[in-house]
Regions:
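Peripheral docking tails and interdomain loops at the edges
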Residues: 1-65, 191-210
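Active-site cofactor/cluster-binding pocket
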Residues: 1-2, 19, 68-78, 83-210
């Protein structure tokens, strides 16, 4: 388009850097950039570039909830059986019900003993969300040590369900759960459940697989 009269302005950017996911909010951010007075060219999505400042400032988060679709996130530990169980669960739903089903799995660099994330969606309508879950109906954490390491409840919707695998009793929960987590549970009407799945697994001969 060089030297062409009334040439269009071409704006480009990159996404997926560092294996970062691209969400509907990111897409909206791109369009907000394009319609701004001085759109940024050669931008990056998903990362915070504090060196060359190519990243776009995120727009107001948008939530695209598909009616009738259940969205679940599971925090697990590598080789604890969480990923395998979720693969079986989503296969059973897809093969034996009339529901549509989708699953994504994310891992860290460790093959065993590292963090795992399972993202499951199932519902009555076709699922077209090609990104990890950013708003969940149900979140489960299968390793109690994560409560002080990660923002486990980020994205859990108001009135959602949180299940924690833990050996702590009620008094210990009050002692060990971070204040930020307790505040979120109270303010967002979260249904909070605990289960000692580790003990149950040992008693029935499953070992470390919960």
């Amino acid at each position: 388009f060089f030297d062409v009269e009334n040439a269009p302005k071409v704006i480009g950017g990159r996404y997926g850097l560092g294996s970062k996911d691209v969400t509907p909010t990111d897409i909206k951010t791109v369009f907000d950039n394009l319609t701004s007075e001085n759109p940024k060219n050669n931008f990056t999505l998903g990362i915070v570039d504090d060196v060359t400042n190519t990243s776009l400032e995120k727009s107001e988060p948008i939530k695209i909830a598909q009616p009738g679709t259940v969205r679940c996130k599971f925090w697990g530990l590598g080789s604890d059986g969480t990923v395998g169980a979720n693969k079986q669960a989503i296969k059973i739903i897809g093969d034996n019900t009339n529901k549509y089903a989708q699953a994504y799995f994310a891992y860290d660099s460790k093959k065993s003993g590292g963090i795992t994330m399972s993202h499951l969606r199932f519902g009555d309508a076709p699922i077209r969300s090609t990104y990890l879950i950013d708003e969940a109906d149900y979140i489960a954490c299968h390793n109690q040590s994560y409560v002080n390491q990660y923002d486990l409840l980020k994205g859990l919707k108001d009135g959602g369900i949180f299940v924690l695998n833990t050996i702590w009793n009620e008094a210990e929960l009050d002692q060990y759960l971070p204040a930020k987590m307790k505040k979120f549970i109270a303010e967002n009407n979260i249904n909070f459940y605990t289960v000692n799945a580790t003990k149950i697994a040992q008693e029935i001969g499953l070992g470390s697989r919960i």
